[in-house]
Amino acid sequence: MTASLHIILDTDPGIDDAAAIAAALFAPQLDLQLITTVAGNVSVEKTTRNALQLLHFWNSDIPLAQGAATPLLRPLRDAAYVHGESGMEGYDFVDHQRQPLAKPAFIAIRDVLMNAPEPMTLVAIGPLTNIALLLMHYPECACNIHRLVLMGGSAGRGNFTPNAEFNIAVDPEAAALVFRSGLEIVMCGLDVTNQAMLSPDFLNKLPALNRTGKMLHSLFNHYRSGSMRTGVRMHDLCAIAWLVRPELFTLQSCFVAVETQGQYTAGTTVVDIEGRLGQPANAQVALALDVDGFRQWVAEVFAYAP
């Protein structure tokens, strides 16, 4: 199968990010042209190291650029309590000498977009700081972005504060800018990602699959978004799944605003499902997931990996 969708992946590895990177690399429908890292689950130095370790593990020559170390206006609040201090606890990766590109992520994204023969798809599975910096410094790049598919937000409850999802809450100002940008946005938030559970039976079969399965199984043992006994949530994989299998998702066009001021609500995505605010829709919001179909696709894409 010839890859037909050219993508750039912005990520903050992160254990579920590792699974998403595997899918982006090995799904035959996708052509991953650049990875950029951002501070989120852990510091940007750690997310960059983790992404480089994964690329070395897979012997991949995909270019990687390090991105923003802090949110636009706020100090970083990370999720080491979910992913471990390193961001990818549980597997001993082999040492390597690979380094990131000698330019920041938003410039690397600009360069790839502006040299592409046609608009490309951005996939963001961490805080949206790098995407906001791109749009702030190079607004003309928006014409070269086919769409932005992101893991973030929620139409209901949060997972970082009572109402805010982690990726949006880490940098609400960046997210607010992105949702106001006019880009075509597909939002895979907690409404679907909390459904994207890999069952204990599925997890137990991973080590026999291949090297990638063994590595991910080791990481999942240290992942705190679920457990090996009850199943683990694959938040970030949903964004990759939508690219390849959009029919697994139920989407609704909605106006989405990001709260930046509230003492208790900063980072909340206000998803106007019923159109009460009278604003034009600015995102396609995923609200339901075919869980069985998702698991089947995950098994298929992991089997493509070495």
Curated annotation (Swiss-Prot):
Alphabetized PANTHER family for the sequence: INOSINE-URIDINE PREFERRING NUCLEOSIDE HYDROLASE, NON-SPECIFIC RIBONUCLEOSIDE HYDROLASE RIHC
Active-site residues from the entry: 235
HAMAP family: Nucleosid_hydro_RihC
Protein name: Non-specific ribonucleoside hydrolase RihC
Annotated EC: 3.2.-.-
NCBIfam families assigned to the protein according to its UniProt record, in alphabetical order: PRK10768.1
Top-level taxon in the UniProt lineage: Bacteria
Gene Ontology cellular component terms for the protein in this record: cytosol
Keyword set includes Metal-binding: no
GO function terms (MF aspect): purine nucleosidase activity
One BP annotation, GO: purine nucleoside catabolic process
Function, in words: Hydrolyzes both purine and pyrimidine ribonucleosides with a broad-substrate specificity.
UniProt similarity note: Belongs to the IUNH family. RihC subfamily.
Top-rank EC class of the record's enzyme: hydrolase
Highest classification ranks of the organism: Bacteria, Pseudomonadati, Pseudomonadota, Gammaproteobacteria, Enterobacterales
Keywords: Glycosidase, Hydrolase
